[in-house]
Amino acid sequence: MKDTSLPSTAGAVNKLIDSLGKLPGIGPKSAQRLAFYLMRAPEEQVLTLSDTIRSIKNQISQCRICFNVADSELCPICQNTKREANKICVVEQPQDILALEHVGVYRGYYHVLHGAISPTEGITSQNIRINELMSRLNDGQVDEVILATNPTTEGEATAMYLSRLITPLGIKVTRLARGLPFGTELEYADDVTLSRAMEGRQNF
């Protein structure tokens, strides 16, 4: 990783710049701007931010049903009994749920795998939440599983694997429509493209 420290800057500031620079999407210049902004910001604002970041590690866990992020036993979506219980949308990461919920065209439940099958990285079906998904399908309530893994090599491999497991159960398996460019992560797709991909999902 590129060194973001500044020789002419105090050690504590350099430490903050270095820490911010380790965040995804934050380059050296952005890290420096954020660090100097935080130095000028009111103390209350900085302390609130610090407490919020700390609470994420101390209070946030995973929903026991879908493995979305949650601050109690169940995430807000799984607590909502008005959603369509016959549909489960399978995603790779919790942030994919945020993208789909923002579009507002899907009213079923979710299942977060926390990854995708990737032999090159040593990630197999046993390393992600596939067994838990199959257990959820045993209650007979679900009649459609929507595979919303990313349109990447790993996402496609995971979707194919899941389809082979789920289809023999007599459950309809669909995949988001091909409007999403290959290699794109779901969380970065625009609302219109994502909406069309969900509404135009196809048998898989």
Curated annotation (Swiss-Prot):
Keyword DNA damage attached: yes
This protein's record includes keyword Iron: no
Protein's GO biological process: DNA recombination; DNA repair
CDD domains xref list: TOPRIM_recR
Residues in C4-type zinc fingers: 63-78
Keywords (A to Z) from UniProt: DNA damage, DNA recombination, DNA repair, Metal-binding, Zinc, Zinc-finger
Domain Toprim: residue ranges: 86-181
PROSITE patterns hit by this protein: TOPRIM
Gene3D superfamilies assigned to the protein according to its UniProt record, in alphabetical order: 3.30.60.80, 3.40.1360.10, 6.10.250.240, RecR Domain 1
Family assignment from sequence similarity: Belongs to the RecR family.
Function: May play a role in DNA repair. It seems to be involved in an RecBC-independent recombinational process of DNA repair. It may act with RecF and RecO.
HAMAP family on file: RecR
PANTHER family: RECOMBINATION PROTEIN RECR
Name listed for the protein in its UniProt record: Recombination protein RecR
Gene name for this UniProt entry: recR
